[in-house]
Structures are given as C-alpha cells and as structure tokens.
C-alpha cells in the first residue's frame, strides 16, 4: 500500500479500532510526529505507538471528515470525541519511499470566542 490516501484511510481505521499492530505497520521506523501548538515531538515508531496507547486512554472515537492525498503527501480532517467533548483535527502526513508514514504534523485547534469587532461580519454555527 503506497497511495497516500489509502494509507490514511488505513491509519485512521487502525487508530479508531485501537489496532496498534496494523498502525505500526503503516509507520516508518523513524517516523516523526509533531504537534506545533503544544510544541510536542515524538521520534520513532515504538515511541509514537506508546504516545498513542498511554497518552490517550479511555473511550475516545475518531470520525474522518475528509482525506486528500497525492503522491507521498496527504492531509486529513478528523473529529476526535471523548466522554467530555469533541475536537476537530487537521493532520498532514508525508510518506517515505516505501509508502510508510514518515512524518505527521498534527493541529488540534481549540474553540475560540468571536472578537466583538467581527460579530457583525459573520454567522456563528
């Protein structure tokens, strides 16, 4: 499997089902994960799997809204939900020459209040 779109479909399905063996098979040995907003970086397949298993315990779910990909690059928009709330996530992926995920750049925006100066310009949803 080396099409970026197919790799992401398999990645999110494995994450949602907590199928860590399948997820591991999609990752390059030296995968690098970064979350710029939190300034988090995780290096290596084993460390990234541990980050997911230990860092996100409990009953959470992912719903894939959109995946776009071309060649060795792809992006996804997912909704993460747990018992307390839901969060949108936008994630960028780069594949290596073997079609494995080599880099993940993850953005999880938090809800923001609308500035009063723009209230008359937008529709809230």
Annotated model-derived regions:
Residues 1-125:
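C-terminal and inter-domain tail/linker signature
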């Amino acid at each position: 499997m080396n099409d970026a779109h197919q790799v992401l479909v398999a990645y999110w399905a494995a994450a949602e089902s907590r199928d860590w063996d399948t997820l591991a098979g999609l990752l390059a040995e030296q995968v690098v994960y970064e979350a710029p907003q939190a300034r988090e970086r995780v290096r290596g397949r084993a460390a990234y799997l541990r980050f997911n298993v230990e860092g996100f315990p409990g009953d959470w779910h992912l719903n894939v809204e959109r995946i776009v990909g071309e060649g060795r690059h792809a992006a996804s928009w997912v909704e993460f939900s747990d018992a307390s709330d839901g969060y949108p996530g936008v994630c960028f992926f780069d594949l290596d020459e073997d079609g494995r995920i080599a880099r993940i750049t993850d953005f999880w925006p938090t809800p923001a209040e609308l500035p009063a100066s723009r209230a008359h310009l937008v529709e809230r949803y």
